[in-house]
């Protein structure tokens, strides 16, 4: 942990690389903020975004910039007359990430599909448990891969999310793929191809069947998602807990030189 004096010094007298990255940090934060306006789940990528920046000031600037679009979007609701000021709490509850705020539709993926026999379940208990597991896995990944390359941290967070999420959106299967392609692990492509094949069966083949028949086929398909879990776990960057020295950016090298 930084002493208060050192913390203030890095803010007021940043390294050249940190100062040069400030402009890009603003744009990166604003883009992340726009993503949060569309969906609240990108918040799990914010730690990796901050790790990609070279210094304390650029990270703080990016974090503040990330909060600007959601705040402006939220304030536009009562200002534009679409929502009363007194109803903002209800809006926050509807879009929040607290376990009690998440829609409790489960049974499409993983462990909740096994619990429900592949049927949709409106019981909020599995959804709450899953949310707590996701948050715990996020903290665990940030600790276990704290010295890893930021992309590897992102891979770990997103794959852990896939293991513990109580519900499934088709877009979830796409989140980790660009990062695994950019920095593939040994089991990256088996995990990618397995998820693609599983999704193709569910979204391209099963949807050709009429209602009742689709519903009966959906059950074994949802439960079969558990077969992908060994591939997802194997695809985690287990051997890359520490970033390679040769791959370190000049900015990070400069920070390390100053510390020494």
Model-derived segments and spans:
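Residue-level signal for functionally critical sites in structured catalytic/ligand-binding pockets
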Residues: 1, 11-15, 41, 165-172, ...
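Primarily membrane-embedded glycan-assembly and transfer machineries that use lipid-linked glycans
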Residues: 1-19, 25, 50-157, 201-260
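Voltage-sensor/pore transmembrane module of 6-TM cation channels
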Residues: 21, 25-54
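Secondary-structure boundary/capping residues
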Residues: 43, 59-60, 188
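C-terminal hydrophobic structural anchor segments
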Residues: 176, 181-204
């Amino acid at each position: 942990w930084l002493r208060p004096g050192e913390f203030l010094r890095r803010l007021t007298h940043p390294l050249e690389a940190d100062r040069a990255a400030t402009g890009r940090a603003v744009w990166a934060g604003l883009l992340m903020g726009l993503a949060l306006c569309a969906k609240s789940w990108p918040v799990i990528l914010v730690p990796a975004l901050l790790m990609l920046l070279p210094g304390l000031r650029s990270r703080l600037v990016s974090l503040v910039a990330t909060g600007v679009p959601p705040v402006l979007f939220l304030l536009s609701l009562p200002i534009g007359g679409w929502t009363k000021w007194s109803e903002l709490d209800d809006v926050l509850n509807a879009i929040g990430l607290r376990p009690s705020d998440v829609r409790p539709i489960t049974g499409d993926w993983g462990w909740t599909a096994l619990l429900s026999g592949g049927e949709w379940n409106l019981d909020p208990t599995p959804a709450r448990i899953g949310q707590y597991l996701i948050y715990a896995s996020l903290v665990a990944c940030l600790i276990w891969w704290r010295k890893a390359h930021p992309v590897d941290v992102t891979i770990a967070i997103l794959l852990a999310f896939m293991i513990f999420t109580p519900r499934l959106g088709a877009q979830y299967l796409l989140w980790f793929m660009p990062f695994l392609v950019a920095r593939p692990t040994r089991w990256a492509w088996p995990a990618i191809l397995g998820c693609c094949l599983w999704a193709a069966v569910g979204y391209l083949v099963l949807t050709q069947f009429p209602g009742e028949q689709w519903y009966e086929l959906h059950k074994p398909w949802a439960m079969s998602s558990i077969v992908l879990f060994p591939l997802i776990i194997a695809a985690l960057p287990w051997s890359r807990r520490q970033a390679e020295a040769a791959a370190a950016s000049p900015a990070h090298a400069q920070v390390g030189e100053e510390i020494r």
